[in-house]
Regions:
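Short aromatic-glycine-(Arg/Gly/Cys) micro-motifs in beta-strand/loop hairpins
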Residues: 1-23
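Short, conserved beta-strand segments within well-ordered enzyme catalytic domains
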Residues: 3-5, 30-31, 56-58
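Short, charged/polar surface micro-motifs in flexible loops or helix N-caps
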Residues: 10, 35-38, 61-65
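Surface-exposed loop/turn and secondary-structure junction residues enriched for glycine/proline
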Residues: 14, 19, 28, 140-142
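Extended catalytic/binding region for NAD+/ADP-ribose chemistry, centered on the ART fold
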Residues: 20-45
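Conserved NAD+-utilizing ADP-ribose enzyme module
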Residues: 23-24, 44-156
Length: 156
């Protein structure tokens, strides 16, 4: 499987040191199998006058059985709870890999409304139900990162 990471620089050797806390799936290295999604991630850097660079990695899914993995097939109550725990710094899980939907602008707005107490969980889930998830994969441990193999990059 080919995976992509959007940034302002090439990342030939991903690490966990530079990952941010309190994001969708917690601290980790985020990639996607969707080139267009990685290009969107580059957009925020390009808007700030930096380069947009998509790094490309090979990943053998057969090794996934060796990893403690959490997968979300849709935006669900479980996904919402996990996102909120991670974003609020309350995640204490030990997953190597987390796979699921990206909180894009529309999804993010719903999550924020719920997080701020302006809508309840039922309303949030109802709003998210019809959103087609973009896919992100978070490599949260060195064990998981060791399975990513850098293949090159391109500047947008």
């Amino acid at each position: 499987m080919i995976l992509y990471h959007g940034s302002f620089l090439e990342i030939a050797k991903p690490d966990l040191v530079h990952s941010r806390p309190n994001v969708d799936f917690g601290r980790g290295f985020f990639v996607t199998p969707l080139y267009e999604q990685a290009a969107k991630w580059c957009g925020k850097f390009k808007r700030r006058g930096k380069d947009g660079v998509i790094s490309r990695y090979g990943y053998d899914e057969n090794w996934e059985a060796e990893l403690k993995t959490l997968k979300f097939d849709s935006y669900s109550e479980e996904w919402l709870d996990f996102i909120l725990n991670c974003r609020s710094g309350k995640d204490s899980t030990d997953y190597d890999l987390v796979v699921g939907g990206v909180a894009n602008d529309k999804v993010f707005n719903t999550v924020e409304l719920f997080f701020d107490g302006l809508i309840d969980k039922t309303e949030a889930i109802n709003r998210l139900r019809y959103e087609k998830p973009n896919l992100q994969i978070c490599f949260r441990t060195e064990k998981a990162l060791s399975l990513l193999h850098f293949e090159g990059s391109e500047t947008l």
